[in-house]
């Protein structure tokens, strides 16, 4: 569907995924200009970072800069209805509608939605009363998963740990808390392009969320990832399509909920009576760190065409081609991630062999060519290779090109599928 038009593109967000999207879009000669709200220290070298005071201001800036396509990857702005506001202003938008964004923004809404669809997911107990929650865990079997404050997901192994998490959650908010049994299995992140009743699956990804080697420590947004995670039969992929994505889109359509963007399903594969079954853990309604920067290097087709076809609701016109290579991403994080903020640190970056991979700048600031850390997941080392082992070796070689005080990264990304005996 390639056209010869020129496009001014606005990307809403300020993390590694926005840098990854921009880095790829910049390679398309039809992209006339890139703008970011707010962007980060890396994106300012790829386009123009705009000062955005509030979400209504973004619409004003988009009109001023004559934006043709907006890509929204910040949940907050999707929930506030930025998609609808930009579309009303005549701008194409790659992003979920306000109503669809509730699938990520509200754990309570998502669980009720999934139950109504008949999608396999963990059983759950929901309450906005601390006493009820404490009473429930007294009789529950551990480990448990506690989803609180609509963002924090904790895997807990002891009652004392659960009590502390629940008490802290109810001190901060009256939002309902979800308590589920922990589902043991092989986890996958499955990203789909959604255009209302149509969808296309992108390569499967495996996100290593726990902070420490061997999948220990607290949950994070992702310490590393591999793609494609194609270790399963076509039959399992069909189950994921037919038992998770199709029922979801059918209900969205029945509820008159528009959706033109990305839907990411976090799935756990469980063996039941000798048969592999996908269970849904969570939904996200946008590109996610770290999946985005792991999948994009596999895309040989135009990212601009992908976004345009999705935003126009014309996925049928899209022909996607993916590389046969493997990709591994490793998050280089600041000392106190993810529990608290860390002091800013100056980054020192050595040259990278781009035949082996590249770096994605995440939570960084830049002043006169000097980069500083500004958050938890600072930089992502991306390795490519003809095998997963080669991609792994390249990712860790690239990770060693970055230096800042307190830098930490997991050294076992891929251990679940590679023969890394010291971590298994």
Curated annotation (Swiss-Prot):
A Pfam family the protein falls into: GARS_N
The root-end lineage is: Bacteria, Pseudomonadati, Campylobacterota, Epsilonproteobacteria, Campylobacterales
What's its EC? 6.3.4.13
Pathway assignment reads: Purine metabolism; IMP biosynthesis via de novo pathway; N(1)-(5-phospho-D-ribosyl)glycinamide from 5-phospho-alpha-D-ribose 1-diphosphate: step 2/2
Positions that bind ATP = 137-189
Residues covered by the ATP-grasp domain = 111-312
Keywords of this entry = ATP-binding, Ligase, Nucleotide-binding, Purine biosynthesis
Please name the top-level EC class of this enzyme.
ligase
Family note: Belongs to the GARS family.
A Gene Ontology biological process term: 'de novo' IMP biosynthetic process
The GO molecular function terms of this record are:
ATP binding; metal ion binding; phosphoribosylamine-glycine ligase activity
Q: Which reaction(s) are listed as its catalytic activity? A: 5-phospho-beta-D-ribosylamine + glycine + ATP = N(1)-(5-phospho-beta-D-ribosyl)glycinamide + ADP + phosphate + H(+)
Name the InterPro entries for this protein. ATP-grasp (IPR011761), ATP_grasp_subdomain_1 (IPR013815), PreATP-grasp_dom_sf (IPR016185), PRibGlycinamid_synth_ATP-grasp (IPR020561), PRibGlycinamide_synth (IPR000115), PRibGlycinamide_synth_C-dom (IPR020560), PRibGlycinamide_synth_C_sf (IPR037123), PRibGlycinamide_synth_N (IPR020562)
Give the protein name, as stated in the record.
Phosphoribosylamine--glycine ligase
Q: Where is the signal peptide?
A: none
Does the keyword Nucleotide-binding feature in the UniProt annotation?
yes
